[in-house]
Amino acid sequence: MLTFIPMYTRALQLSSFTSLFFLVFALVIVVTRPFVGYLFDHHGPDATVYPGFAFFCIGFILFSQVGGVPLLLLSAGILGIGFGALAPAFQTLAVQSAPPSRAGVATSTYFWSLDISVGLAAAVLGVVSDALGYPFMYGVVCLTSALLGLVYYFLWRRSGKRAGT
């Protein structure tokens, strides 16, 4: 969870690089967005969703092992690719799943769900990080990402609702 990054970098005595982490994260999202859009539009949601989950998982594993600035920034870039792939893909899937007259409702529901999940995850993962530490917590986030990839496969792809493909 991005919520804990400032606290984790402080614990690692890398807090002076927290802003740089978020800068790299944001720049990678912006730079990769056109490529992600192209992949989604020309190859369907699977071309962005599965790699997005993989990049997220790899990024959090790397982040859990950070000991210095290079790995901190590498993990920021990899997490940026993952987030930059998943966020627009799921927003597009939400909109494509609704009738055109309900696109606004689908968009607001997507963002409402995102906000709720971020808030709940922060609460649960706060307990995990207090009990077992940040590296373990980021391992849990990686495992959760992998499990959500499976949920996507079984609930979306298998349901035949392959929007945009």
Where are these regions (language model features)?
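Intracellular juxtamembrane helix-capping segments at the cytosolic ends
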Residues: 85-98
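Structural signature of the two symmetry-related core transmembrane helices
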Residues: 47-62, 142
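Helix-loop boundary and gating motifs at the non-cytosolic
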Residues: 1-8, 12-14
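Helix-to-loop junctions at the C-terminal end of transmembrane segments
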Residues: 32-44, 129-130
